């Protein structure tokens, strides 16, 4: 009887612990989103990069909008595993915002880029960023020209290019499958 009570107490403690951790992670993600949006607004207002929190190793660099999908996310600098946990991010190997070339953004298939599974050629995409060279916000509009599933070794669509392009990449298939043997690539050209 006493063993049953101890076992019941342990199960209750374990359940409360798991529930508490889930609530903590959700609250942390919500707070991070608020801080990232606040840092983006500060960056646009001041013309200087603002980290979302003091120890952040990234900062917001753009806003990505896909109107048909009701998609509106802040893009972070540097597609590292830590940065990608908080939002879509710019690959360092791609073009810089506002410069000619292939601007490459990455995001997780289970969260930030999950809506891309519904994107189709012809969809408009808008990128907004603060151009520190001219001291003002700028916008570039794109149209999706291609959606393709490729092998991870096929990096031709991520390569630097003299052609202005926007490339969005995520793992494939979408969802929470343990494997992601392919990549889902969206290519868009400026209007």
List each model region and its residues:
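Solvent-exposed, non-transmembrane regions of membrane-associated and secreted proteins
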Residues: 2-191
């Amino acid at each position: 009887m006493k063993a049953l009570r101890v076992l019941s107490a342990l199960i209750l403690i374990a359940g409360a612990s798991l529930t508490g951790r889930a609530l903590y992670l959700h609250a942390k993600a919500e707070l991070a989103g608020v801080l990232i949006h606040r840092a983006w607004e500060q960056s646009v207002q001041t013309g200087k990069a603002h980290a979302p929190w003091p120890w952040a190793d990234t900062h917001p660099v753009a806003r990505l909008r896909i109107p048909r999908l009701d998609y509106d996310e802040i893009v972070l600098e540097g597609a590292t595993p830590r940065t990608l946990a908080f939002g879509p991010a710019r690959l360092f190997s791609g073009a810089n915002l506002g410069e000619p070339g292939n601007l490459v953004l990455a995001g997780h298939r289970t969260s930030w880029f999950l809506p891309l599974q519904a994107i189709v050629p012809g969809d408009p995409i808008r990128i907004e960023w603060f151009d520190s060279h001219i001291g003002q916000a700028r916008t570039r509009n794109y149209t999706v020209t291609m959606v393709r599933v490729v092998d991870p070794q096929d990096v031709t669509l991520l390569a630097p290019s003299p052609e202005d392009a926007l490339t969005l990449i995520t793992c494939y298939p979408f969802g929470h499958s343990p494997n992601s043997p392919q990549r889902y690539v969206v290519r868009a050209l400026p209007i």
